[in-house]
């Protein structure tokens, strides 16, 4: 899990998110936060639905996937739970929620890499 991540507030325009986060940082999905509470996630697929002429007047909260439609995990969930939830989504990450707050992001490729490393080393672990 990474705790150092970029996010955006809900009222920011799509164009600003693309200009400031997506392109320079190669981010494929960005949490949308109200304070420290996750309200949604805006992914490349969401942004692509907005015509470029509308980037300057379309806020991300109009195109994001709301938190109620997202798969999430808690910091205490076992690795098997994360793997199961990744199987149910095409998103590259799972938000990690504790007490209603976003505390980190779990990236699919990191989890897969961890599992592969365990297999290569013959190590069994719960997380």
Locate each region found by the language model.
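Methionine-biased hydrophobic packing positions in alpha-helices, especially
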Residues: 1, 21, 64-66, 86, ...
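Bateman (tandem CBS) regulatory domains
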Residues: 1-5, 12-16, 58-70, 126
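Divalent metal-coordination and catalytic microenvironments
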Residues: 30
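Short hydrophobic beta-strand motif reused across regulatory alpha/beta modules
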Residues: 39-47, 97, 105-111
């Amino acid at each position: 899990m990474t705790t150092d991540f970029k996010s955006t507030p809900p009222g920011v325009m799509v164009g600003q998110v693309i200009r400031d986060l997506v392109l320079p940082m190669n981010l494929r999905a960005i949490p949308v936060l109200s304070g420290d509470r996750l309200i949604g996630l805006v992914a490349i697929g969401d942004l692509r639905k907005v015509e470029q002429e509308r980037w300057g007047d379309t806020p991300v909260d109009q195109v994001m996937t709301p938190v109620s439609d997202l798969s999430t995990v808690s910091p205490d969930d076992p690795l098997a739970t994360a793997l199961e939830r990744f199987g149910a989504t095409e998103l590259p990450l799972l938000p990690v929620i504790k007490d209603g707050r976003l505390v980190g992001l779990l990236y699919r490729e990191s989890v897969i890499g961890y599992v592969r490393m365990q297999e290569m080393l013959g190590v069994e672990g719960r997380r």
